[in-house]
Structures are given as structure tokens and as C-alpha cells.
Amino acid sequence: MFVSLSEKKKFLTWLVNTAPFGRREVLWILNYLLTHDAILNNVHFVENVEKTDRGIRVVADGLGKEPLLLFIQAQEFTDPEQIFHEIRMNWRKALYLECVFPEAWQTSQYLSVLEDNPFAPWNEQVDQEVARAIDQYFKQEEQTQRMALLKAQIDDALETGNKEAFLELSDELNRLKQQ
């Protein structure tokens, strides 16, 4: 998914003005990103940033997590100056940013910039039981749709007097019902 620079700026502006960040360094870094297009072009908003090769997590107050954390190759850094230096010196590299704030999933501004984390894709994080339930649902839905189509074709065969098609389609419908 491609997220435009203007969408990123719109989100960061909203985040800076709305989310309650207790450490001023968080706001400094977000504002720095906001005012440097070349860097912001390489920023990707993701979840599970700790799984990326280079990412930052910013956390709003009251959520019980470190408010500012840099991850580089599974190592953690909390020093704001070191984090700023990393951003500034490696501005050409992709930077993954996770923003943790209350009701993030109910916020359209956040959802409009959220991308799939290439290091931890969403579809690989689905519980196996949930995946089986989803697969079962789609199989059932496919069978329901197939039965509806067969019934419509049987009706057409009756209306046109096509006895052979009627018998063939009826047999297929009966086989589907027995599954």
C-alpha cells in the first residue's frame, strides 16, 4: 500500500495535536519527521515495529510502555538524542514507525496511513483456529452460493422444459445437500 506524503503529514499533524505524549522528545521527533519530507517519504506506519530492522515506537501517556523506543536489528535504544541522531544520519533508509495511543483502531487518520509490516505480515499473525473458522465460513458460503445458482438453473430448466438439464442439476443439488 502506498501512502502519500500529504497523508503522512496530515496524520502526524493530527497525532501531535491530539495524542497525550508526556515526553517532549516524542513531540520533537514527530515534528522533525513532519518538517523533513525526504525523511518522511521513507517512513512507514506499522505495528509490531520491534520486528523490523529499523523502527521507532512512540507511546502516548498512560499506556504503561516506554514512551520512545528505537529498534535496530532487535536491539532497543531509549536515549532521545541517539534516536534523533539515527533518524538524521540514516535518512535515506526505510524507517518504520509504530504509534501507540488510545483507541488507535477507531481512528480513521491512523488507519489511513497504517501499512502491513513486511517483517511481520498481518496474515501470518492470525491464530490457526481463527484461520480454520474463516476457511470453514468461506467454504460454507461458497456452497450456499453454488446451491442458489443450481436452484436458479433448475427453475430455468423447468421453465424451458429441459428435462435432461433438470435431472442433471437436481442430482448435483442433492449431492451438495448431502455434503
Swiss-Prot record:
Superkingdom to which the source organism belongs: Bacteria
Signal peptide per UniProt: none
InterPro entries: IDEAL_dom, UPF0302, UPF0302_N, UPF0302_N_sf, Virus_scaffolding_prot_C
Transmembrane segments: none
Family: Belongs to the UPF0302 family.
Alphabetical list of NCBIfam families matching this protein: PRK03636.1
Protein name listed in UniProt: UPF0302 protein EF_1554
Annotated source species: Enterococcus faecalis (strain ATCC 700802 / V583)
